[in-house]
């Protein structure tokens, strides 16, 4: 039994030695390596490999990043629902299925994005009512279904460039939680 164990150890050490000769040829060929030398060079090589991989491809510990993302979704969804109760009219809920970690950019190229991940219907910010003091409510968000003369069906998604270009120059006041230039926060 002991002979088999020693034979396995020696075979593994010879394999390590032949692998290390390729990487440390200048150190190995000059002298005969002892078992301790082979093990030391193996540890040195594994540490250098580990350090080089950490710099190239940082991996979060465990699954902290995806689980953190999933834990944020319910809170944001609840915040959006509270916005409905206040009367902001925001009806663009987050999709709970997205907690699985899938995003639009993770889909293969050339494939249609699933209906769950299509952008929400474009909305229009209504101007704020006459200033009622520093704590006046934010302007209301009006979706096409709540605008007069609009149908209740959702229009097809538009490219991001056309959606983003709708708001500039309309003269509408957009509420920002951090405030905007000219707001009196006193």
UniProtKB/Swiss-Prot annotation:
GO biological process: regulation of neurogenesis
Record-level GO cellular component terms: chromatin; nucleus
Region (Disordered): 128-186
Main location group: nucleus
Motif (WRPW motif): 175-178
Extent of Low complexity compositional bias: 142-153
GO molecular function per UniProt: DNA-binding transcription factor activity, RNA polymerase II-specific; protein dimerization activity; RNA polymerase II cis-regulatory region sequence-specific DNA binding
Pfam family, any one: HLH
Keyword vocabulary terms for this entry: DNA-binding, Nucleus, Repressor, Transcription, Transcription regulation
Stored CDD domains: bHLH-O_HES3
Subunit (UniProt): Transcription repression requires formation of a complex with a corepressor protein of the Groucho/TLE family.
Known role: Transcriptional repressor of genes that require a bHLH protein for their transcription.
Entry's free-text remark on domains: Has a particular type of basic domain (presence of a helix-interrupting proline) that binds to the N-box (CACNAG), rather than the canonical E-box (CANNTG). The C-terminal WRPW motif is a transcriptional repression domain necessary for the interaction with Groucho/TLE family members, transcriptional corepressors recruited to specific target DNA by Hairy-related proteins.
Protein name from the UniProt record: Transcription factor HES-3
Gene field: HES3
């Amino acid at each position: 039994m002991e002979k088999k164990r020693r034979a396995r150890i020696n075979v593994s050490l010879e394999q390590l030695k032949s692998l290390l000769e390729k990487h440390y040829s200048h150190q190995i060929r000059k002298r005969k390596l002892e078992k301790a030398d082979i093990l030391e060079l193996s540890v040195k090589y594994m540490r250098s490999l580990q350090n080089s991989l950490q710099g190239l491809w940082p991996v979060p510990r465990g699954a902290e990043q995806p689980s953190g993302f999933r834990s944020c979704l319910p809170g944001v969804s609840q915040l959006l629902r509270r916005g409905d109760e206040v009367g902001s009219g925001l009806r663009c809920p987050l999709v709970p299925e997205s907690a699985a970690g899938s995003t639009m950019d993770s889909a293969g190229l050339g494939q249609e994005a699933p209906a769950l991940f299509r952008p929400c219907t474009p909305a229009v910010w209504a101007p704020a009512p006459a200033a009622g003091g520093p704590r006046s409510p934010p302007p209301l968000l009006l979706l096409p279904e709540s605008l007069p003369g609009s149908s209740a069906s959702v229009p097809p998604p538009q490219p991001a460039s056309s959606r983003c270009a709708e708001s500039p120059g309309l003269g509408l006041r957009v509420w920002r939680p951090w405030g905007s230039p000219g707001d009196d926060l006193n």
